[in-house]
């Protein structure tokens, strides 16, 4: 499988959310899903009284999603790339002011020696289904204490045990530091 360059999925430019299109025939602000050119786009409202709008785009067969959040006027607030359909940012995280001007670009890779691509390879080698709704990859970074982890949650097997697996990989070298196995109740 071809290695995806997640750094090319977003840019630092201002963007706008089409509020009129989202709200057309959608008074309750229900989530909308659509597929455009092999990209699944989910749009929804969030926050109190729809104070923000969120768009999550995932290409077919991609291990990454693009998360974008917009204010009530439709101007971009922030955007970043995540592991497929989750919150943990990888690469650059772009933050924008109320006028849509870029205010910060945070490097989410700082402190991690083990790359997102290496985590994906680890999952493939360990038969973890990256495209299952039961699988998610999160990240934890405590820069003050220099603690960095990837947290992989999936439904499956680990060393002869089956259930919900929660695996903590060292963010520096990728070694599993802790693995929890919970009965899935199946």
What are these regions, as identified by a protein language model?
Residues 1-85, 89-95, 101-108, 115-142, ...:
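Periodic aromatic/glycine/histidine/acidic cluster detector
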